[in-house]
């Protein structure tokens, strides 16, 4: 896929995610693999519902901008580490929904477990509701290199992992294609909303 096509996918993802309320204002960041050694990412500080072609830039997998004058998101390393350690990943999405933010703050454990939901089959590799989808939760950290170092061991030991939460911050998920990552965002958001409603009903 060409750079122009990948950029358009990122722009369209931004409009969709903003429209669903999962990427308010200038929050969130999105990316797509450009080559084996490069990625396209959203430029820092841009409104995700109003992205244009100039709001996307190329970086290397160390997170360095390859386009003078354009600054990538501060969280670029969390994208590029996925492209580095998982060759099959073609797109990464990071969102800041209310459900993801609140649920990650309410959960004192370092992970969430979802089971017996039919929608679990929306995740790549999951073929039955009779399984578990485990979502790790990492404490927020302004030092992104340090945060990435905490995430890496989980990625290394859990190849089935489809996404993770940063406490009080948001969700990261990914897929072979942008459409896969978007599908998983929707599935995660459904599960997060179900979990919050279950907790409210059960007063826990």
From Swiss-Prot:
Record text on cofactor binding: Binds 1 zinc ion per subunit.
KW Membrane (keyword) present: no
Gene Ontology BP annotations: L-methionine salvage from methylthioadenosine; monosaccharide metabolic process
Keyword set includes Metal-binding: yes
Ligand binding (Zn(2+)): 94, 96
Gene Ontology molecular functions: methylthioribulose 1-phosphate dehydratase activity; zinc ion binding
Catalysed reactions, as listed in the record: 5-(methylsulfanyl)-D-ribulose 1-phosphate = 5-methylsulfanyl-2,3-dioxopentyl phosphate + H2O
Pathway as given in its UniProt record: Amino-acid biosynthesis; L-methionine biosynthesis via salvage pathway; L-methionine from S-methyl-5-thio-alpha-D-ribose 1-phosphate: step 2/6
InterPro entries membership: Aldolase_II/adducin_N, Aldolase_II/adducin_N_sf, MethylthioRu-1-P_deHdtase_MtnB
UniProt keyword annotations, A-Z: Amino-acid biosynthesis, Lyase, Metal-binding, Methionine biosynthesis, Zinc
EC number per UniProt: 4.2.1.109
Superkingdom, taxonomy of origin: Bacteria
Named cofactor requirement(s): Zn(2+)
GO-annotated cellular components: cytoplasm
Function: Catalyzes the dehydration of methylthioribulose-1-phosphate (MTRu-1-P) into 2,3-diketo-5-methylthiopentyl-1-phosphate (DK-MTP-1-P).
Alphabetical list of HAMAP family matching this protein: Salvage_MtnB (MF_01677)
Recorded family membership: Belongs to the aldolase class II family. MtnB subfamily.
Name of the protein in question: Methylthioribulose-1-phosphate dehydratase
Native source species: Pseudomonas syringae pv. syringae (strain B728a)
């Amino acid at each position: 896929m060409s750079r122009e096509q990948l950029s358009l996918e990122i722009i369209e993802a931004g409009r969709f995610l903003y429209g669903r309320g999962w990427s308010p204002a200038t929050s969130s960041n999105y990316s797509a693999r450009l080559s084996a050694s490069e990625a396209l990412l959203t430029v820092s500080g841009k409104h995700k519902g109003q992205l244009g072609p100039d709001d996307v830039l190329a970086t290397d997998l160390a997170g360095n901008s390859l386009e003078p004058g354009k600054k990538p998101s501060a969280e670029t390393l969390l994208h590029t580490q996925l492209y580095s350690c998982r060759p099959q990943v073609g797109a990464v999405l990071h969102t800041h929904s209310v459900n993801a933010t609140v649920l990650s703050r309410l959960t004192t454990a370092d992970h969430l477990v979802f089971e017996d939901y039919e929608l679990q089959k929306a995740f790549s590799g999951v073929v039955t509701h009779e399984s578990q989808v485990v979502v790790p939760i990492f404490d927020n950290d302004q030092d992104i290199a340090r945060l990435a170092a905490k995430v890496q061991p989980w990625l290394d030991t859990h190849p089935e992992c489809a996404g993770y939460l940063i406490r009080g911050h948001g969700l990261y998920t990914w897929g072979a294609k942008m459409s896969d990552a978007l599908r998983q965002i929707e599935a995660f958001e459904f599960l997060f909303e179900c979990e919050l409603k279950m907790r409210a009903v059960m007063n826990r």
